[in-house]
Regions:
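Conserved "right-hand" nucleotidyltransferase catalytic core of DNA-directed polymerases
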Residues: 1-9, 14, 29-31, 36-38, ...
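Short, surface-exposed connector motifs at secondary-structure boundaries
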Residues: 66-69, 214-216
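Short, conserved, GDST-rich strand-edge loop motifs in beta-rich repeat architectures
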Residues: 20-25
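Aromatic-residue hotspot detector
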Residues: 62, 80, 84, 295, ...
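A short acidic-Thr-Gly-centered motif at the start of a beta-strand
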Residues: 1-2, 64-67
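Active-site-proximal helix-loop-helix substrate-binding element of RNase H-like nuclease domains
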Residues: 32-61, 68-169, 176, 180
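A short acidic (Asp/Glu
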Residues: 15-17, 83-88, 233-234
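Cytochrome P450 core scaffold surrounding the K-helix E-X-X-R motif
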Residues: 13-17, 51-53
């Protein structure tokens, strides 16, 4: 089986970036654009890393020359690159490896998960910073010189990722590598279709129920703002009111402030009425159930549902949720 290592460079700006959006939202957003991609394919004959920057159609032609069906494809934070490969270009590799996931299983949080930190730890080379200069630039905005520097940056990332993969590979068994492959593909090759009509009906039901509850509370605003009365209201819904030690009096008091984590945790309570009550007390306009349902509706409008799981999210080796 051949080994392919790749890295995509994409458009981002201050409002449209992976720090503002989920990976799914970012890639399926109308503003998404591939600036360029670097690919290195190693088989029986060594091949140097190739860079390409062009239109979506030309980039697809460039990518089609590689043997994806017969290769193990490696990337750092592979959910991002594999989702682009699959959703934008319709390419689904035979096997996938993610150096970020591999490093979590080996180092947990000791080293850090960034390519920069891992490359430094294994003394593989230095990661560049050219991506910082790409803020707000479309592909056509780059000068030839700027694009050449960006190409060097991307190629270097591919070289570092390949070296990192080879450094980590002996430390993991085949079973773990298969689990990483499966975890990445649950996101990059989703098959579950959400029913928008069902979700919309659920959202309307949740909102109607909240409105009815809020109408009752509006008739007696003192209940929602009075600590003792609000505590009793929570108890009627089977919730033990959270408490804390008052820094002023040194005595136990109700923890109903916006900064009280135990109280804010009730925003995610399984009972929608409890969510609504706590939202009203905190002045939050939407409950968690509303927000989640709206998020599912938006995903359904864009495509199938990716499953964002993080391999080896804790030191016990369990999976954890990713994105939102």
């Amino acid at each position: 089986m051949k080994l392919i290592t790749l890295d995509f460079e994409t458009y981002y700006d201050k409002k449209y970036s992976l720090s503002k959006l989920t990976t799914e939202e970012y890639i399926r957003h109308p503003d998404f654009e591939v600036i360029g991609v670097a690919v290195k394919q190693c088989g029986t004959v060594f091949q140097e890393t190739k860079w390409f920057s062009g239109t979506k159609e030309k980039t697809k032609e460039f990518l089609d020359q590689f043997d994806w069906d017969g290769s193990l494809v490696v990337a750092h934070n592979a959910v991002f690159d594999m989702a682009i490969l699959s959703w934008i270009f319709g390419i689904k590799p035979k096997r996938v490896a993610d150096t970020l996931s591999m490093s979590r299983a080996i180092h947990s949080i000791e080293v850090g998960g960034s390519l920069k930190a891992l490359a430094a730890h294994y003394q593989l080379g230095e990661k560049g910073t050219e991506v910082i200069n790409a803020l707000g630039k479309r592909r056509i905005d780059f000068t030839d010189e700027e694009l050449a520097r960006y190409a060097e940056y991307c190629i270097n990332d591919v070289e570092l990722t390949e070296k990192l993969f080879k450094a980590l590979l002996p430390k993991l068994n085949v079973t773990e590598l298969k689990l990483i492959d499966l975890t990445i593909k649950m996101f990059s090759e989703p098959t579950l279709e959400l029913d928008v009509d069902v979700l919309d009906a659920h959202l309307q039901g949740v909102q109607k129920k909240k409105q009815d509850l809020m109408a009752k509370i509006e008739a007696d605003k003192k209940t929602i703002m009075s600590n003792p009365k609000f505590a009793e209201l929570l108890k009627t819904h089977g919730v033990v009111p959270p408490t804390k030690i008052s820094p002023t009096t040194g005595k136990e008091t109700y923890a109903f402030a916006k900064s009280d984590e135990d109280f804010r945790a009730l925003l995610d309570h399984e009972n929608e009425d409890v969510q609504a009550l706590v939202s009203a007390r905190l002045g939050v306009k939407s409950t968690i159930e509303e927000t989640r349902t709206e998020r599912f509706i938006n995903i359904a409008m864009r495509g199938t549902l990716p499953i964002p799981l993080r391999y080896y999210a804790a030191h016990t080796g369990r999976w954890g949720g990713d994105d939102k």
